[in-house]
A protein has these predicted regions:
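C-terminal segment of classical bacterial N-terminal signal peptides
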Residues: 16-24
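Positively charged n-region of N-terminal signal peptides that target proteins for export
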Residues: 1-10
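Surface-exposed repetitive/solenoidal architectures
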Residues: 24-161
């Protein structure tokens, strides 16, 4: 009986040892540590920047997630050949979620001299489907554009409702 109990206990320990003892929280943001990770992050996730990065192109088309710069610097080195230029091309409101960009320090330069909708955080913000919040962001970058230009946003569409 004693051998059987020890055997069962040993099997139980071996089986439980196959499972990780520490699991990441399901709602923990994905860490971004490079420009490559920034450029390829899915548009609707939750992210936290864990290192200073240099970006040479805006992020995709429509960002609808949460981005926490965590006090890190994003150096912009962008020459715009199209409209909608910034760290993000567009921030697009999402139903049931507040799109948020916070705690970002911007440096560097955006040169889109013949273009419009150019801003440090985003070229354009459209809160039509849900709210957009930008908080505790600082821009020391030089931004050159033809029209609809701003230190944080190039332009913002008002809610149709």
């Amino acid at each position: 009986m004693k051998k059987r109990l020890v055997s069962i206990l040993l099997v139980l320990v071996m089986v439980l040892g196959m499972f990780p003892t520490v699991a990441a929280a399901a709602d923990a943001p994905t860490e971004i540590t490079s420009a490559e990770e920034f450029a390829t992050m899915p548009a609707s996730g939750d992210y936290i920047l864990k290192a200073d990065i240099i970006i040479t192109a805006p992020y995709g088309n429509n960002f609808s997630g949460t981005f926490d710069g965590d006090g890190h610097t994003v150096t912009l080195d962008i020459t715009g050949t199209a409209n909608y230029v910034g760290m993000f091309k567009n921030l697009t409101g999402a139903a049931g979620k507040t799109v948020t960009v916070k705690n970002v320090i911007l440096a560097g330069k955006i040169d889109a001299a013949s273009r419009g909708n150019v801003g440090g955080i985003a070229g354009f913000a459209n809160p039509y489907s849900g709210p957009i919040k930008i908080e505790n962001c600082k821009n020391t970058a030089t931004i050159i554009a033809k029209e609809k230009v701003g230190g944080i946003l190039g332009s913002c569409q008002s809610d149709a409702n």
